[in-house]
Amino acid sequence: MRKGLLVILLLCSIAGMSWNWWPLPMAEPDTTDRDSLIYLAGLSATAGSGRFSASMISENEQGATAITPFSGSLRAAIIKPATRPRRWYDYDGAIDITGMIHSPLDEAIYGNGQGRFPVYRGKQGSVIIRQCYAHVRLYIIDFSAGVMPVSDHMDTPLGTGSLLLSHNAPSMPTLHIGIDRWTPIPGLFGYLEIKGGLTHAWLTDNIAVHNSMLHYKYAGAQLGGRLPVNISYEFHHAAQWGGYDAAGNDLGNDLHSFKNVFLAHSGGHSYNESFNAQGNHLGSQQLALTLQGKGWHIKGYWQNLLEDNFNFIGRGQNLSDGRWGIS
């Protein structure tokens, strides 16, 4: 009897922390009275003695830095950040372009960039669009379109991306729809939150396979809300698919092929895809535990990588594999 009474009191106290049945940021007053623009311009140069520039120079730059030892670049950008999280709508966007000159690759060793480095293919100068996109949030739904990095929204602030998608990869023409930030489920007082999204992008490197595409989707749930301890789980799925091979053969670019890729079903024209899965598929999961208080939080997480078959986190993988992190 006493245990039952304690459980009831605990549930009442948790609910009493917030009687708002759907505690969205938009429920609070919007105290921001203006938007802002950021103007950016920069000039940089590198010089080195090896065949490549230092790897740290290229980290988190979306492929907009030269890998050769001598280079110079000019960057100009106009950025409109999202500044109104409590308004029922918000928007942001950017135009960010880098012009670059660089020393040639060692053709005897690297084949004039035909393989690993297509941006350097017979050139000593490039213009790279880092970002040219627009994003709109309508209440809880996010829409994005344009040239931008494909982000997997995983929490890796000290690295170059998650195990699945890298911040070193060039930006791509992209369409995206989703719920990009943790959003409470109506009626649960904010103690269960979800997020997820669907992205379609066009790859631009055109090595061996031309005009191929990227399919990416993710979903996550977080339990805890305003409690001192939160636990969250996310699943991310990416697949390269479609395009045309060197002989011009169609590798599957229609809606039926997209359905196979979306569901990771077999199909396509190649022998392997006819009994395996159409497209090249990779998945990743993240399990995270967050401790939080007023003005601070600390998160410990584990990410793993999946290929071909899905296994729930902890099944089919060694716990020591993957990435362990704290943020």
Predicted regions and their residues:
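Surface-exposed loop and membrane-interface regions of Gram-negative outer-membrane beta-barrel proteins
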Residues: W88-V136, S151-N168
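Transmembrane beta-barrel outer-membrane domains
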Residues: T65-S71, G122-I129, N168-M172, H210-L214, ...
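Short loop/turn motifs that connect adjacent beta-strands in outer-membrane beta-barrel proteins
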Residues: W21, M26-Y39, K80-G93, R137-I141, ...
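Sec-dependent N-terminal signal peptides
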Residues: G4-S13
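Extracellular loop and loop/strand-boundary signature of outer-membrane beta-barrel proteins
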Residues: E59-A64, M100, G115-Y120, G159-L165, ...
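Transmembrane beta-barrel strands of outer-membrane/channel proteins
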Residues: Y39-A54, Y91-I101, V136, F143-P149, ...
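Signature for the C-terminal beta-barrel architecture of outer-membrane proteins
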Residues: G178-S327
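Transmembrane beta-strand segments of Gram-negative outer membrane beta-barrel proteins
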Residues: W21-L74, T83-I97, I194-H200
